[in-house]
Regions:
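Cytosolic covalent-transfer regions centered on His/Cys nucleophiles
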Residues: 5-10, 14-208
């Protein structure tokens, strides 16, 4: 364990060790045997997946107020189609001056290339990371929006500044990971205010 003292453990996400550790480190740790690694494969794999999920949730939690806001949230609107809600959310971002006039066209260009729907959620975004400010506009619908061949109940329109390229991938994966959980999705469908949505996100992240 003395060898670890010279390392920057703060940059570690997960630490595997073959000896007991007597100090607390700011990362997930797991002790494994150096022998019969194949028999420990499932435990190692589960540990990696759980650590990755905790990391994604941590990034979503720490970035929540940086990218989500009340003025970019709409719930149970009368809009029912993909085009209606996309145009509306694009307008919200432009009114806040987080995107320029060409943003909407690039969102549709990306959408026409292949759908951004996954099950009952959709995460549309521009073909370019040229947003003035990285932000996420959210639409929630109990009835759902017709999204190509899917019915989606949650739409996250991502506007990404190129300076946040890494954050884009992390947020993308975090949103899919969290709202792919059917029980969380069902709760989200019932959100009528930004505050309810925020509480839902935080409460489920804290359970991880």
């Amino acid at each position: 364990e003395e060898a670890l003292q010279s390392l920057d453990i703060s940059s570690f996400g997960l630490l595997f060790t073959t000896v007991p550790l007597y100090h607390t480190y700011d990362c997930d740790t797991i002790q494994i045997s150096p022998f019969n690694l194949s028999q420990q494969y499932s435990v190692i794999q589960e540990t990696i997946v759980n650590s990755q999920n905790r990391y994604k949730n941590h990034k979503l939690k720490t970035n929540f107020h940086a990218f989500f806001e009340k003025d970019l949230f709409v719930a149970n609107t009368n809009m029912t189609s993909k085009n209606q809600i996309l145009t509306y959310l694009c307008d919200l971002l432009q009114v806040k001056r987080y995107t320029d006039a060409g943003f909407e066209e690039k969102v549709y260009k990306r959408e026409n290339a292949s759908t951004t729907a996954f099950g009952h959620i959709a995460i549309p975004h521009s073909t370019d990371m040229d947003a003035i400010k990285t932000s996420i506009a959210v639409a929630v619908s109990k009835k759902g929006f017709q999204w190509d061949n899917n019915t989606v109940h949650l739409v996250f329109l991502l506007a990404i500044n190129k300076a946040d390229k890494k954050t884009f991938r992390e947020l993308y994966e975090s949103l899919i990971s969290l709202f792919s959980n059917d029980s969380i999705l069902q709760e989200a469908r019932s959100c009528t205010t930004f505050e309810e949505f925020e509480t839902l996100v935080y409460s489920n992240i804290n359970q991880e």
